[in-house]
């Protein structure tokens, strides 16, 4: 007799296959207005291999920018750094500070594709999200990244806040991006549910295979999960995973089958966009730099770059 875990997994796979079978017909990429494709984040520039600031989060953000430039990256995504908010850009960051972040990136030949400012309190309304959008625009960044859409009680309200935020962001040529992070948006089917409620051309999904494993305690393989978001994915946070709960890995050294995953993502319509390396094997700055170079080569080879 199957265990409860096996039954839960069968239910998940059944839902995933059902979503995947009809995904092309309801693809937000297919349905998006032509002007949405002109937004910087959604333009077809090929594969944009980049890196998050997370491996350098205990340093000033300029240290991370220097290292990423030295490692050969031209595209970066902003998250943790040694600031009063613990983020490079957060809702509490001023416009002037955000402008300075953008200038520091451009001085190093770096383009900012994504900005994660921490947990934006969507259930409290749209003020913090609008501040993030303003700050991203000031920095010349292409998108605001969100990692949650509230709990089951606030889910619909939070989706409404994001939809209204998308309307505001469109005026500033900014895209709002959601990636899986457990809770109500921890799997592909949950991400699709959010996307269907938000229903905006400048809303999109950044896939995160490491988080699919992490928040399912290793029970859900991202290769099985990703068909549920066919047509929605325009970027990937390149993160690996090792059980029981480790994502502090250089991509290609863990459990994620990246070649198989990329083949399935491409089948689902993900053919260009940011590929931002989020985590590296920890170590001193010299070690981190070496791992960043190794990870860049791995991702470039993965997509034939």
Role assignments for model-derived ranges:
Residues 2-20:
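N-terminal secretory signal peptides and thylakoid transit peptides that target proteins
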Residues 16-26, 63, 104-111, 117-207, ...:
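Active-site acidic/histidine proton-transfer and metal-coordination neighborhood
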Residues 27-50, 54-58, 66-67:
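C-terminal segment of N-terminal export signals and the immediately downstream linker at the start
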Residues 46, 65, 166-263, 267-268:
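Acidic/histidine-rich catalytic cores of soluble enzymes
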Residues 47-53, 76-78, 112-117, 144-146, ...:
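Hydrophobic faces of well-ordered beta-strands that scaffold small-molecule active sites
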Residues 58-68, 124-135, 219-226:
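Short, acidic/polar
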Residues 64-81, 139-140:
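Catalytic domains of carbohydrate-active enzymes, especially glycoside hydrolases
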Residues 77-100:
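Glycine-rich, proline-tolerant flexible connector loops at the mouths of alpha/beta enzymes
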